[in-house]
UniProtKB/Swiss-Prot annotation:
GO molecular function: carbohydrate binding; cellulase activity
Organism per entry: Salipaludibacillus agaradhaerens (Bacillus agaradhaerens)
CDD domains on file: ChiC_BD
Subcellular location: Secreted
Keyword Cytoplasm annotated: no
Active site: 165, 254
Protein family: Belongs to the glycosyl hydrolase 5 (cellulase A) family.
Classification lineage: Bacteria, Bacillati, Bacillota, Bacilli, Bacillales
Subunit structure: Monomer.
A matching Pfam family: CBM_5_12
Keywords: Carbohydrate metabolism, Cellulose degradation, Glycosidase, Hydrolase, Polysaccharide degradation, Secreted, Signal
The protein's name: Endoglucanase 5A
One annotated Gene Ontology cellular component of this protein: extracellular region
Residues binding substrate, per UniProt: 61, 65-66, 92, 127, 228, 260-261, 288, 293-295
Length: 400
């Protein structure tokens, strides 16, 4: 009997190990249903029952450059295979972003609506960077967040990040950032009284200690903290601990495994120290970034499918590490996602008369349409605007 029992236990362990190696981290298809409305209690992010919540997920890269990776299918894969429960849509303001091309907000809407359908949380990120002072485009920010909160304020999925990384020696919490937040937050609250708002802090969202000493009055505000494992270490962890001791709620809305440039590394040992630090303090986070860009913080390799279904070969060292970390802590039982089909498969019998199709227009938004350009037909594989057909890594697939 003892021998039979031993064999049975071994078989069970074998099945369990096989399952771990061949299924996903979590079937997070009921995250928001489970946690509901988020809020802040005693400096902690909590769900509608007052229980602590830790969100873990991915940030996009700039939507104006790598928006092809932000779509329902890729976000579903991240939820089902990686186990994410939050996704951050990084909409740059400058550098070809919203200020130059307001239509990029359509990709933000696509991400938000996908997150709502997938029942995960989503961060709408007003991604200031080279425009170091959030007040430069304050009026545009107010208009944008008025629109977003009016559209999505009734959904508990939504989190607003109103200033990604204020920076520069003349941009301080008390003189620039807090006054900016005190103008933008009421715009959101007019439409959405409850959802979480993340506010960036000085020195590229590192100076949470300054915000902690002079906090905003809104009860559901969190303060952004950003780090890159190859550059930032114990002194910044000490600043976070100080802020937490003052009762400030911290959200690590961007972090990378690389140096602060987004490249160099990958620094996995240092990243693990940070992962442990965040877990011990129940800090929510989003990793930078979901892109195939040739930099070490990118989660994907060049040529990766924009709609998910990524093989090990399509994940970068950073992406492999981050996926493993999210899977380790995902709290919902494993599922077995079906890799999505490639929406970019060309029509096997393209029409012979190009005259039936419109010429490519750089001002037009395309999602799956066919256009005529430079003597041939092209079909959009994902959302695109002002990206000319012909780039082998771009959104257009040749049909003839």
């Amino acid at each position: 009997m003892k021998k039979i029992t031993t064999i049975f236990v071994v078989l069970l362990m074998t099945v369990a190990l096989f399952s771990i190696g061949n299924t996903t981290a979590a079937d997070n298809d009921s995250v928001v249903e489970e946690h509901g409305q988020l809020s802040i209690s005693n400096g902690e992010l909590v769900n509608e029952r007052g229980e602590q919540v830790q969100l873990k997920g991915m940030s996009s890269h700039g939507l104006q450059w790598y928006g092809q990776f932000v779509n329902y299918e890729s976000m579903k894969w991240l939820r089902d295979d990686w186990g994410i429960n939050v996704f951050r849509a990084a909409m740059y303001t400058s550098s070809g972003g919203y200020i130059d091309d307001p239509s990029v907000k359509e990709k933000v809407k696509e991400a938000v609506e996908a997150a709502i359908d997938l029942d995960i949380y989503v961060i709408i990120d007003w991604h200031i960077l080279s425009d170091n002072d959030p007040n430069i485009y304050k009026e545009e920010a107010k208009d944008f967040f008025d629109e977003m909160s009016e559209l999505y304020g009734d959904y508990p999925n939504v989190i607003y990040e109103i200033a990604n990384e204020p920076n520069g020696s003349d941009v301080t919490w008390g003189n620039q950032i807090k006054p900016y937040a005190e103008e933008v937050i009421p715009i959101i609250r007019n439409n959405d009284p409850n959802n979480i708002i993340i506010v960036g802090t000085g020195t590229w969202s590192q100076d949470v200690h300054h915000a902690a000493d002079n906090q905003l009055a809104d009860p559901n505000v969190m303060y952004a903290f950003h780090f890159y494992a190859g550059t930032h270490g114990q002194n910044l962890r000490d600043q976070v601990d100080y802020a937490l001791d003052q009762g400030a709620a911290i959200f690590v809305s961007e972090w990378g495994t690389s140096a602060a440039t987004g490249d160099g590394g990958v620094f996995l040992d240092e990243a693990q120290v940070w992962i442990d630090f965040m877990d011990e303090r129940n800090l929510s986070w989003a990793n930078w970034s979901l892109t195939h860009k040739d930099e070490s913080s990118a989660a994907l390799m060049p040529g990766a499918n924009p709609t998910g279904g990524w093989t090990e070969a399509e994940l970068s060292p950073s992406g492999t590490f981050v996926r493993e970390k999210i899977r380790e802590s995902a709290s919902i039982p494993p599922s077995d996602p079906t890799p999505p089909s490639d929406p970019g498969e060309p029509d096997p019998t393209p029409p012979s008369d190009p005259g039936e199709y419109p010429a490519w227009d750089p001002n037009q938004i395309y999602t799956n349409e066919i256009v005529y350009h430079n003597g041939q037909l092209w079909q959009a594989k994902w959302w695109t605007q002002n990206q000319e057909p012909g780039d082998p890594y771009g959104p257009w697939e040749p049909l003839n």
